[in-house]
């Protein structure tokens, strides 16, 4: 009904390739075997046909049960993948990349894992959670540029493994965990103190206007690397670090980050263009405490304008997603869209609030919501507009 496909992960920590094979057999094999017949007994005559499988999750993380070294994981993932393909050769598999770019083994982990699994996987995973522990808004809005770096580094590593094999195969990227998340990470706020309550509130991050801007920057980073990032999963969707909040027996409302996500989904369809951006820049230092020590990442020459351009060849339309990272000044934008002949503005919206700590709530669900963007000038291939300070904006032209 929702028009989606599942992505399932097998357990390669406390379990192994045999358990992975059995799970796939249960899901995808037509019948006549122990596990497929068990599925049929459970009421599902036809196979589920799950095509996308993750070979474990964050296996480099010491918080995982039976975390692995890169060699340990790589060997186990290779054997699991081999056995799974014997059951269903049509599946697509993702190997675990580093749990974060700040992990001590980052880089070497990807290299070693892919040297083991290259012939058996289509993807390697990436995870990122943006934060503003330092209370530095400018750095927070610049940190999606580190996502760009992360993606480009992993692509380079994957392609180096291919080059060593003299292979034309290209490993794609599965950015299967990403979001803004930091307030509820440290407080372990909802740990069960006594008993086993049903559905207690857990990790209910309340998102601000500021968060929506950083989130929008992450959306742009993903779109601008659509040639290699072939799947990207927001973690999570409802209540737990989520764009949608609910109350038991009560209201449901959209958090601030809902809007960039919804607009990326609606307008980010077509062909991602390689836009050349000429913008004033600023320098920042991003703080990320992930790992055993504090990590400070310099971000040099972050452009105030972060932009993604999407062409819809069917309608000959052009969609622009733009982030103005200047905290106090509007940004005049001129786009030269070579070959574009559109004459009308289909949609023009901006997400902006003078209070960057503004939030949505059950009492005020539309406190932060898209508003109409100001006048847009269309003159042939030249498009002119002005972005409010600290804003996320979407323009659709046809």
Regions found by a protein language model. Give the residues of each.
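A structural motif corresponding to the C-terminal end of an alpha-helix
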Residues: 1-5, 83-90, 120, 154-170, ...
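Conserved, mostly hydrophobic/aromatic
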Residues: 23, 53, 93, 124, ...
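N-terminal catalytic cores of secreted or lumenal carbohydrate-active enzymes
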Residues: 1-131, 135, 152, 159
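Short, surface-exposed beta-strand/loop micro-motifs that present aromatic residues
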Residues: 303-313
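Aromatic/acidic polysaccharide-binding cleft in carbohydrate-active enzymes
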Residues: 168, 173-305
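C-terminal beta-sandwich/jelly-roll accessory domains of carbohydrate-active enzymes
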Residues: 280, 285-302, 315, 323-398
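Flexible loop/turn segments at secondary-structure boundaries
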Residues: 14-18, 60-63, 100-105, 130-136, ...
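Extended catalytic-interface subdomain
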Residues: 122-131, 136, 140-161, 167-185, ...
